[in-house]
Amino acid sequence: MSDYKQTLNLPATSFAMKGNMANREPNMLKYWAAKDLYGKIREAKKGKKSFILHDGPPYANGNIHLGHAVNKILKDIIVKSKNLSDFNSPFVPGWDCHGLPIELMVEKKVGKPGHKISASDFRQKCREYAAKQVNGQREDFKRLGIFADWEKPYLTMDFGTEANIIRSLGKIAENGHLHQGFKPVHWCTDCGSSLAEAEVEYKDKQSPAIDVKFTISDESVADKFSHPEGHKGEGEIGAVIWTTTPWTLPANRAIAVNAEVEYTLVQCEQAGEKQRLIIASDLVTTCMDRFGFDKYHALGFCKGSELELVQCQHPFYDFTVPVVLGEHVTTDSGTGCVHTAPGHGVEDFVVGKLYDLEVANPVGANGVYLEDTPLLAGQHVFKANASVVELLKEKGALVHHHALDHSYPHCWRHKTPLIFRATPQWFISMDKKGLRQDSLNEIEKTQWIPDWGQRRIESMVEGRPDWCISRQRTWGVPMALFIHQDSGALHPRSIELIEEVALLVEKSGIQAWFDLEAIELIGDDAKEYIKVPDTLDVWFDSGTTHESVIKARDEFDGIADLYLEGSDQHRGWFMSSMISSVAMNGAAPYKQVLTHGFVVDAKGHKMSKSLGNVITPKEITNNLGADILRLWTASVNYTQEITAGDEIFKRQADAYRRIRNTSRFLLSNLTGFEPANHMVAVEDMVALDRWVIDKAARLQEEIINAYDEYEFHVVVHKLMNFCTNELGGFYLDIIKDRQYTAKSDSNARRSCQTAMYLIAEAMTAWMAPILSFTAQEIWEALPLPVSGERDEFVFTGVWFDGLMKQESKQDESTESSDELGNEYWTELLTVRGEVNRALEQARKDKSVGKALEAQVTLFATADLAAKLAKLGDELRFVLITSKATIETVTSAPENALETEVEGLWLTVAPAEGIKCERCWHVTTDIGESEKHPTLCGRCITNIDGEGETRQFA
């Protein structure tokens, strides 16, 4: 064999078999940065149609986790695929830099502002901390192969962005959506601040559930219930409420009933004492069972509307409260009579406004009753629950008491229960100017992917309260407003003043506002107007980036095409962006919204340090490389929960090896191939080569379409299938003989090299958005194209167009002339699969060794036999056997193997003849040449003659 080795076209390439990407990628990143690859892409796409994917800013605190990695990789895949589709798709990464988590981290180091450190210095420390966090996260994102304007990201703490956030507030105020209100909001006693809807999470909590009697002294109330003459009953009359927040009873100012609900006056007995209780008719049985009352009967019935303004005695304070009507009252649970504390509940507040009820607010920002709260002063509200229960027992007002496990709002940061607390706050009104309906209209115009996202955000917008945008924090964008110190009215020049403040902030940052004396801006008006001390909700910061970033930066043109974040952002960034954009501009800030699920472990559990199941992006990139992490991200259906685990990543590494090995095979067989000199015209190509190019062309259309539809798992699936089935399992296997043994410059060899070159060019672009490092590595190993020039980077170009030309020519020359087209070769692929199974069985039976030591006979029906016969003697090359014979199905022996191909039976036998030393085919013509006694005639022609001719395979 050694004598003839030099006559073979053996593969050779510098493209390594082992990726070793964990070590290779960092050097590639350094080179890309030195070459300003992102800038080169921008230059190449200048003037092209724009596609804007706006980056939702992660919070600048802590290391990135797998969820961050998934999010940024998905965005990167989209941006890279859009650039390859010849869009100008810049990507500007952002960070959310203000807010409580950063304050808390800084407090741990320097103390609270106003104590050991001034508010001004505290803000500077927050700015420095956020900058450090941004730098750390930026390096982590770069390591993932994310292409972005890393040198000029947007930060919500950039002076220019802070100024534009203030301008956004001005625009919303100018459009009439801003108002000040005294209203119950979710309040975290640990934060000492109100929370946005998106900052509230619901967790199970055990609370004291109590039924409380509010005594009614007016005996005539019994007459409102239709009872027989003389049967008014006996004992004290009382309306019974049910609540799980006993601590709110000091703020009770009414009992709400539903006007349309029927109520019963129930005669009952408790501890030998007769009493008459008012309860919704539908709940009487349930309530009596809960109270443990055996003896009871109905005295009479009336509608809730009959009870309006009946006065009830507060259970432990010396005043009465009215019965009011509220549509929010139902008979789903409780008693049908609802405890109403306007300072501690949104529905209570709304009803309270209708009846001009006092908005009692006896609870301080720290969750402790104020000093003037009778009986409970100085107690924390949650600890006071027990005190309230004891008070009710003393007063004889406690009807029943038990512990209840239920879902309750908690702070997403502290994981502690929240309270509703009425405070003076600034709101964006959802209804005053029709913002709710306008937002719903814009939601309908937007494309939501998956489509259930639309209904989700619609229901949230339909039910959400006014957006409380004020916070009582130190590190945040100020609400640059002046209000009258007595009336609270906004300064008449508020819109102009906001712009003046914005100009100052643009130069010096938010500290400019806090340093500003009112007199400097409003002159003598400072005697009557004061600065609003509040800062803006951080969701306002990020929610207005469509204005403060997209409209402010030169590389963006128009509104964003796409927002892409986790599914929790329907109630977060997607909603805050929609509401603020509609409030400012009357239109949605995006055309499409795409969501991904959360990352969970292999068992479906959320990743957490306490469970010990956390996998960090750094672990994966250090061990396997970023391309494996990127492949995993692309291969899953990211619209659902995304499963991660060591075994899962190992499987991705196996899949990666398949793609890499296929690419290496293509490259290693292009040694010495110069497209400018060696490309074979499509009409001169071997039929099988024409087919595989056509297959690749069709596949490219499907892959580009999958990228356009954001279905990256489809891209990976199709790429893997192509590498495994059409290439690895069929085409590349078949052409090895021709590639290695044919005359080096023969049409037979150059034809398959042409096909491999075109496929390699196309495949490199297909994988570039996902396997970015590997694609560039392949790109650098490809031969120069026909033009003789190649862009330095695959990312500055477009999808390969050589396949499309091949496909169009084949359509004309092949399909229409009844040659061997896609359908034919697809059927041959199936036949070959059956032959392979038969050969495998023969190997197990030890009747043959390797496939080339076998001859196969195909017993086929007339139609199938005619198709197979089209290949003539070249059928054996497709089946990779030394001989292939076609016989009629009627001549099949009894031991012929029936296949899954209709009308096909097979027999396998040892091939007759001697094994050729060069090509390893077993033939009967070996020894006929004195010069090459160990070679077959075909190999002799390929060495000394003009070379064999291949027409089909």
Swiss-Prot record:
InterPro entries: aa-tRNA-synth_I_CS, aa-tRNA-synth_Ia, Anticodon_Ile_BEm, Ile-tRNA-ligase, Ile-tRNA-ligase_type1, Ile-tRNA_ligase, M/V/L/I-tRNA-synth_anticd-bd, Rossmann-like_a/b/a_fold
GO terms of biological process kind: isoleucyl-tRNA aminoacylation
GO cellular component: cytosol
Molecular function GO terms recorded: aminoacyl-tRNA deacylase activity; ATP binding; isoleucine-tRNA ligase activity; tRNA binding; zinc ion binding
CDD domains in UniProt: Anticodon_Ia_Ile_BEm
Residue numbers covered by motif 'KMSKS' region: 606-610
Reaction equations catalysed: tRNA(Ile) + L-isoleucine + ATP = L-isoleucyl-tRNA(Ile) + AMP + diphosphate
Binding site for L-isoleucyl-5'-AMP: 565
Cofactor(s) listed: Zn(2+)
Quaternary state and interactors: Monomer.
Family of the protein in this entry: Belongs to the class-I aminoacyl-tRNA synthetase family. IleS type 1 subfamily.
Protein name: Isoleucine--tRNA ligase
Organism: Colwellia psychrerythraea (strain 34H / ATCC BAA-681) (Vibrio psychroerythus)
